[in-house]
């Protein structure tokens, strides 16, 4: 692990001294991932100067680790022939992603300049959504027939893997029409007799991905089965490519990032994470505004609730002091519940079949926590205002609101799931609005009842 900022400062010193030979040696000595971190901290002109000092193979490795906007920027700034060679050195799926982020004219120009076989394979990948198995797969994999012997397979691997630069994870077995029949691990090959036929040792119980599977499905399958790669098939079970574990990790990271954004009411949709962080102000507004309208409408309803109980506020202005306390604690426990359920639904630990059990469980937990904090708030208010009745009202409201918040926080994601709406996107704004509206209504209703009872007792005493 290197200190990125210290390294960047050193690079700038070397650039200032114009000792490029020394800098070239140092840059090529870094791991591609570290080099990508360094490049993200450099200014555009510094990036270009440093990039021209890196070997082409190292440059291609580093490009994979850069965010899309920087990939396009760097390749657009360097010589076109050099950029084409670097793209050719990328894995097919990475090349498809990079070219897909460019302007259409630039994409076509590069595809026309690349070797025909490579260009055709990349074009095919670009036909698929980059977040599906078709867009993430690589067409480079090892395939054999079931009638081959172990010795024939091993000889074939030695020849083919080096020739096509294939990263070898598993060997796949197909028929003459490319239908996927089975899979072989390297361990099985190395521990079997040379004369054994593939059909006798292959695993026909295949875990596979469909070409249209989205990244959440891909991540779930990899997490469940822990394979280094998975085959990708079309609707006719033709083997089309493989998705490797590192690509699945990238998909999982993107999925997690999207869920985090969604839980805050940021609708990514077709907008990339990099566009939200580094793109135009309008792009960021477009991602963040939609669900704020839901919150706006909900809070206007909450304002109307306060207005309905205006007479209570005038008679007991002190109740307004406790509104932030009630809203804050109810909001927090609601957020806790919603986070647990949304994450559980995402990972498969929670299913819609267990909905009732989780609703009852979270509601009970919310009630218990609410009762605990309700007692604390009652005692605090009694000690502070010397008014037990007021403290009791605030405490009861606290217990009810926290139980309601936990219930809403649990019920909302399940409801969204049933309606085929992403629970992560909608749940945050919905629960915030619902908790505020219902919480205020419960609180003011209790306060009004307390005020009415107080007035009734006062009249009886006067009479």
Residue ranges and their predicted role:
Residues 454-461:
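Conserved small/polar residues in nucleotide/adenosyl-binding loops
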Residues 209, 434-441:
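Cytosolic juxtamembrane regulatory segments of multi-pass membrane proteins
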Residues 106, 121, 402-403, 407, ...:
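Mid-bilayer segments of alpha-helical transmembrane spans in multi-pass integral membrane proteins
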Residues 256-407, 411-425, 429, 433, ...:
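Alpha-helical transmembrane segments and their membrane-interface boundaries
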Residues 184, 243, 330-336, 460:
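Gly/Ser/Thr-rich beta-alpha loop segments that engage phosphate groups in nucleotides
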Residues 1-270:
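Hydrophobic packing positions in regular secondary-structure scaffolds
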Residues 17, 44, 56, 80, ...:
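Membrane-interface junctions
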């Amino acid at each position: 692990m290197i200190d990125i900022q210290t390294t960047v400062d050193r690079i700038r010193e070397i650039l200032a001294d114009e000792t490029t030979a020394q800098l070239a040696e140092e840059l090529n000595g870094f791991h591609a991932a570290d080099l990508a971190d360094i490049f993200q901290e450099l200014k555009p002109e510094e990036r270009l100067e440093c990039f021209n000092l890196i070997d082409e193979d190292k440059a291609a490795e580093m490009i994979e680790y850069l965010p899309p906007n920087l990939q396009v920027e760097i390749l657009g700034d360097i010589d076109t022939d050099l950029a084409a060679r670097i793209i050719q050195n990328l894995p097919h799926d990475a090349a498809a992603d990079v070219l897909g982020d460019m302007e259409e004219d630039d994409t076509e120009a590069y595809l026309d300049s690349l070797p025909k076989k490579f260009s055709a394979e990349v074009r095919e990948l670009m036909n698929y959504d980059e977040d599906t198995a078709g867009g993430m797969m690589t067409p480079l994999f090892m395939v054999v027939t079931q009638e081959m012997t172990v010795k024939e397979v091993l000889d074939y691997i030695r020849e083919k893997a080096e020739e096509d630069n294939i990263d070898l994870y598993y060997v796949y077995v197909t028929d003459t029409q490319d239908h996927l029949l089975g899979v072989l691990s390297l361990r099985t090959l190395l521990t079997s007799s040379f004369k054994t036929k593939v059909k006798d040792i292959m695993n026909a119980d295949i875990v596979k991905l469909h070409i249209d599977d989205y990244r959440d499905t891909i991540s779930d399958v990899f997490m469940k089965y822990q394979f280094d790669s998975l085959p990708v098939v079309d609707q006719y079970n033709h083997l089309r490519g493989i998705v490797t574990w590192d690509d699945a990790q990238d998909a999982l990271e993107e999925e997690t990032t999207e869920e985090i954004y969604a839980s805050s009411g940021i609708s990514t949709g077709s907008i990339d994470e990099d566009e939200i962080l580094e793109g135009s102000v309008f792009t960021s507004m477009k991602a963040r505004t939609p669900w704020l309208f839901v919150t706006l409408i909900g809070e206007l309803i909450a304002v109307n609730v306060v207005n309905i109980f205006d007479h209570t506020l005038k008679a007991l202005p002190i109740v307004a002091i406790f509104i932030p306390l009630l809203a804050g604690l109810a909001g927090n426990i609601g957020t806790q519940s919603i986070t647990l359920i949304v994450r559980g639904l995402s990972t498969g630990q929670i299913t819609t079949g267990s909905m009732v059990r989780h609703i009852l469980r979270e509601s009970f937990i919310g009630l218990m926590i609410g009762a605990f904090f309700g007692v604390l708030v009652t005692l605090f208010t009694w000690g502070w205002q010397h008014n037990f009745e007021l403290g009791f009202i605030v405490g009861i409201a606290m217990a009810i609101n926290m139980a309601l918040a936990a219930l809403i926080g649990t019920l909302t994601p399940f409801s969204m799931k049933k309606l085929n709406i992403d629970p992560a996107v909608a749940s945050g704004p919905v629960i915030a609005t619902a908790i505020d509206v219902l919480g205020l209504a419960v609180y003011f209703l209790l306060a009004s009842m307390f005020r009415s009872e107080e007035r009734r007792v006062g009249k009886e005493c006067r009479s």
